[in-house]
């Protein structure tokens, strides 16, 4: 249930989103923008316990976005500093911020058109913001309604079906490298992307699948190794890196052994990239930049009617938010 605060939105004070995505900005710049926005987010945090926080940071494989309530001057400063990094940011305010997030959650702004993973990624970003700060009502309203309508969009409308997915790319790459179905696969981390790839490959006939995680897992027909037991000298033909925190989870000496096994492939799904050492062989290391390039080449076109319908829903909720805030201000007079 959203809780209304005392905030207001006017010509100077906007509800907005600033960010970069796969469309305009390369992986290296997205990594830099993520670090910058993580620091910039601190300026949106409440200075006193009774104040409300005014930001949500969304970071995925293909986009980095900061949603917040601030003056135009603050957003302009952020945009300028991001451009100085060589990245190309976008900024949407008020009703356009609503329509943008609704399209993002609905999978209509994704590299993999109609993907479902983004719904969970947005929800986790929202829940993390709630844990860290008492969030302003307008941001509660924006994210709760976007998550609700994203789910409705998928259940009531037929999203475009596609085999142009990250798991499909992985299978394509394994076939190109002539990787046998008997190859041993190690998934570092039980992340959503690792799970989706593992179960996809299992259906394609790969049976020697191992997950490495902090805690014991309940896995059927798959093996597990705990973090303290993993060794890259073991004969894993393919290693999948599922999250950025892996970079700091193991000593550098362990990482340096990642290329010791001849012919090994490493897929790095993380942004920022998880591998802390230079690849010994570039054609054996595949990061999200290469994956994004392949997905972009095979990308399906957006369905205009579905995109427009999501935007219209976002606009209606923007108008609803303004009515709610106006009633709140009127009641306090």
UniProtKB/Swiss-Prot annotation:
It comes from the Bacteria. The record marks 100 as: Important for activity. InterPro entries: 4pyrrol_synth_GluRdtase, 4pyrrol_synth_GluRdtase_N, GluRdtase_CS, GluRdtase_N_sf. GO terms for biological process: protoporphyrinogen IX biosynthetic process. HAMAP family: Glu_tRNA_reductase (MF_00087). Homodimer. Possesses an unusual extended V-shaped dimeric structure with each monomer consisting of three distinct domains arranged along a curved 'spinal' alpha-helix. The N-terminal catalytic domain specifically recognizes the glutamate moiety of the substrate. The second domain is the NADPH-binding domain, and the third C-terminal domain is responsible for dimerization. This is Glutamyl-tRNA reductase. It comes from Chlamydia muridarum (strain MoPn / Nigg). The gene is hemA.
């Amino acid at each position: 249930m959203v809780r209304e605060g005392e905030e207001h939105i006017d010509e100077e004070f906007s509800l907005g989103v600033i960010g970069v995505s796969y469309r305009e900005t390369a992986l290296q710049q997205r990594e830099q923008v993520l670090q910058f926005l993580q620091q910039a987010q601190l300026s949106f945090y409440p200075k006193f316990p009774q104040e409300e926080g005014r930001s949500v940071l969304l970071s995925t494989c293909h986009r980095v976005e900061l949603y917040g309530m601030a003056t135009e001057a603050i957003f302009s400063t952020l945009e300028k500093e991001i451009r100085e990094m060589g990245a190309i940011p976008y900024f949407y305010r008020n009703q356009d911020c609503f329509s943008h997030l609704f399209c993002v959650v609905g999978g209509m702004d994704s590299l993999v058109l109609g993907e479902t993973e983004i719904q969970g990624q947005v929800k986790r970003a929202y829940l993390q913001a709630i844990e860290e700060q008492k969030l302003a009502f307008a941001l509660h309203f924006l994210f709760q309604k976007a998550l609700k309508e994203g789910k409705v969009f998928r259940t009531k409308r037929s999203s475009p079906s596609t085999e142009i997915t990250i798991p499909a790319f992985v299978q394509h790459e394994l076939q190109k490298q002539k990787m046998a179905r008997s190859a041993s696969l190690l998934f570092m981390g039980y992340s959503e992307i690792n799970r989706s790839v593992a179960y996809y490959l299992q259906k394609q006939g790969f049976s020697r699948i191992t997950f490495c995680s902090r805690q014991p897992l309940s896995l059927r027909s798959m093996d597990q190794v705990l973090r303290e037991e993993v060794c890259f000298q073991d004969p894993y033909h393919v290693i999948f890196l599922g999250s950025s925190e892996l970079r700091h989870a193991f000593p550098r000496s362990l990482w340096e052994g990642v290329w010791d096994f001849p012919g090994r492939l490493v897929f790095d799904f993380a942004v920022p990239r998880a591998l802390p050492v230079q690849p010994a062989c570039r054609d054996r290391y595949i990061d999200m930049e290469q994956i994004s390039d392949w997905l972009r080449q095979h990308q399906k076109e957006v369905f205009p009617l579905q995109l427009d319908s999501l935007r219209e829903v976002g606009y209606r909720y923007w108008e609803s938010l303004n009515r709610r805030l106006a009633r709140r201000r009127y009641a306090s007079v």
